[in-house]
Design a protein with these regions (language model features):
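Helix-turn-helix
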Residues: 3-41, 45
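Short coil/turn segments at alpha/beta junctions that flank glycine-rich nucleotide-binding fingerprints
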Residues: 10-14, 79, 120
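Amphipathic alpha-helical packing segments from all-alpha helical-bundle domains
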Residues: 55, 59, 95-120, 130-134
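Helical hydrophobic small-molecule/effector-binding pocket
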Residues: 66-90, 95-98, 137-148, 179-180
C-alpha cells in the first residue's frame, strides 16, 4: 500500500501506473490486478487506509471552529503527502467512490456540527454548511501548503515563525468567517 500511496500522491489516479507500483512494491502487476481488480479499486483502498490511519480526522466543534482550522493546518504541515493525496481525491475520485464510505461519514458529522452551531448561535446561519466547511478546509490548506510554494517563489526559507504566523492567520480567518453578525 505504501508504494501505491506514493504513486497516487505523485501522479494522481489518471497518471498513476500499476507497473510502477508493482516495481516499487516488489510485486507483480498481475497480482495487484487479481487482488484489486482495477487501478480505481486500488486507489479506493489507498484512500480508505489513509483516512482510517490519518490524524487528518480533526474533530470539528462548533464551540472552537478556529481550533479545527488550526488542527487541520498542523496535520497538513505534518503530512504533506496526505495533503497532496487529498487534492488528488478531490480532483479525480471516481463516481460512486464515496457511497457508504468512511469519508462520507466523517464529513456528514462535520456538517451536522456546523448545523448545530448555527442553531445554537455559534456560527453565522447565513452560511450554507457545505460551503462553509469547504472554506474552512481550504483556509487551512491554503495557509499550510500553498504558502510553501510562495516562499519558494520569492526565495525565502520557511521558518517556524512563518508557520506560526500562518497558523494563527488561518485560525483568525476562521473565527471571522463563522462570526455571528
Amino acid at each position: 500500500m505504501a508504494a501505491a500511496k506514493a504513486e497516487f500522491t505523485e501522479h494522481g489516479l489518471a497518471g498513476a501506473r500499476l507497473n510502477r507500483i508493482a516495481i516499487n512494491a516488489k510485486a507483480s502487476k498481475e497480482r495487484l490486478y487479481s487482488y484489486f481488480e482495477s487501478k480505481e479499486r486500488l486507489f479506493e483502498a489507498v484512500v480508505a487506509q489513509w483516512i482510517s490511519d490519518a490524524p487528518y480526522q480533526v474533530p470539528l466543534s462548533a464551540e472552537d471552529v478556529p481550533g479545527y482550522v488550526a488542527g487541520l493546518f498542523d496535520n497538513i504541515v505534518a503530512d504533506p503527502q496526505g495533503a497532496r493525496l487529498q487534492r488528488w481525491i478531490e480532483l479525480e475520485a471516481p463516481d460512486g467512490m464515496f457511497d457508504n464510505h468512511l469519508l462520507r461519514r466523517i464529513f456528514q458529522a462535520k456538517l451536522d456540527e456546523v448545523r448545530r452551531g448555527q442553531q445554537c448561535g455559534l456560527i453565522d446561519p447565513a452560511w450554507d454548511p457545505k460551503s462553509l466547511l469547504m472554506l474552512l478546509i481550504d483556509i487551512a490548506y491554503s495557509m499550510a501548503a500553498s504558502g510553501f510554494s510562495i516562499d519558494r517563489i520569492v526565495g525565502e526559507p520557511l521558518s517556524e515563525r512563518t508557520l506560526a504566523d500562518r497558523r494563527n492567520a488561518a485560525a483568525e480567518a476562521a473565527r471571522r468567517l463563522v462570526g455571528v453578525s
